[in-house]
Regions:
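A short, N-terminal "cap"/entry segment at the start of jelly-roll beta-barrel domains
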Residues: 1-36, 116-120
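Short histidine-centered beta-strand/loop micro-motifs
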Residues: 31, 49-55, 96-98, 117-118
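Conserved short histidine dyad/triad with adjacent acidic residue
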Residues: 40-55, 89
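Short beta-strand His + acidic residue motifs that chelate non-heme Fe in jelly-roll/DSBH
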Residues: 50-52, 70-71, 87, 92-99
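Glycine- and acidic-residue-biased ligand/ion/polar-headgroup-sensing regions
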Residues: 57-69, 73-74
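Short acidic-glycine-tyrosine-enriched beta hairpin
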Residues: 74-90
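A short hydrophobic beta-strand segment most commonly corresponding to one strand
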Residues: 86, 100-118
């Protein structure tokens, strides 16, 4: 068993062409410590988000702080702390804090899932 204190996790800048604005990542469990999952926190500063993309596995988002948006090709939904979102494998989507408040979420995916960016 391993207990992780989120308040003690280092925040690293998430520099990637997938993100717009200032985004930070906190790895909850090192990929070498689990056989099944990628598990981290993504912290979106106000005005930041990721671009449209899709994954080869389902993705679960658990909003831990703030208010943000999760969008697909068909809809945009406002989400806030306590909301849980299931994004099926292959669904084109984006998520983040495009408005005036920051938003953080835990992301859970199957280990080995691939991400395809679909927005320049």
């Amino acid at each position: 068993m391993k207990v992780v204190r989120i308040s003690e996790l280092p925040r690293e800048s998430a520099i990637s062409p997938l993100f717009t604005g200032e985004v930070f990542r906190q790895v909850i469990v090192d990929p070498d410590e689990t056989q099944s999952f990628n598990f981290s926190i993504v912290n979106f500063s106000a005005g930041s988000r990721n671009k449209f993309h899709q994954h080869t596995s389902d993705q679960i988002l658990i909003v831990t702080e703030g208010t943000g948006v999760v969008a697909t090709d068909q809809e945009e939904r406002t989400v806030s702390a306590g909301d849980v979102i299931l994004i099926p494998a292959g669904e084109n989507h984006w998520h983040g804090a495009p408005g005036g408040t920051p938003m953080s979420h835990i992301t859970v995916q199957t280990k080995g899932s691939q991400t395809q960016q679909n927005e320049p």
